[in-house]
Amino acid sequence: MLDSRAGMATILLCGVDLLVRSKLEALVPGHRFETSDGVEPPDLVIADVARLDPDDVADRFPDVPIIGFTNHTDTAGLRRAHAAGFDQVIAKSALFERGPEVIDRLLASVE
């Protein structure tokens, strides 16, 4: 749940490897990154669609903004995430370039 006093959000990482997690933590400091479901619902989900079924992720978190990413060559995965209703679908390289602005924009929509 977004802690508006501290500006800290809980971001659930689904299917995300350790390298991606550490890059995201460095790019977007001040938020709590989780890799498993906690008691509280997350404020945002970031999912690697190469490792997970986008429909399953969207079904589990219908009221939470979702960012899906995969390699830029996985156009089928990007299309599946878009069709599943993800709020943002992005290539992995673009996630690291534009991630902070995308995350901030989606978190602002839940405040």
Predicted regions and their residues:
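Two-component/phosphorelay signaling modules centered on CheY-like receiver
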Residues: 18-34
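Non-catalytic signal-transmission and effector/linker regions of two-component phosphorelay proteins
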Residues: 1-10, 102-111
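Short acidic low-complexity segments
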Residues: 33-41
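Conserved phosphotransfer microenvironments
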Residues: 42-61
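A short, hydrophobic beta-strand element within the central beta-sheet of small alpha/beta folds
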Residues: 64-73
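Alpha4 helix (beta4-alpha4-beta5 surface) of REC/receiver domains from two-component response regulators
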Residues: 73-87
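Conserved acidic segment of CheY-like receiver
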Residues: 9-17
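Output/docking surface of receiver
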Residues: 36, 85-100
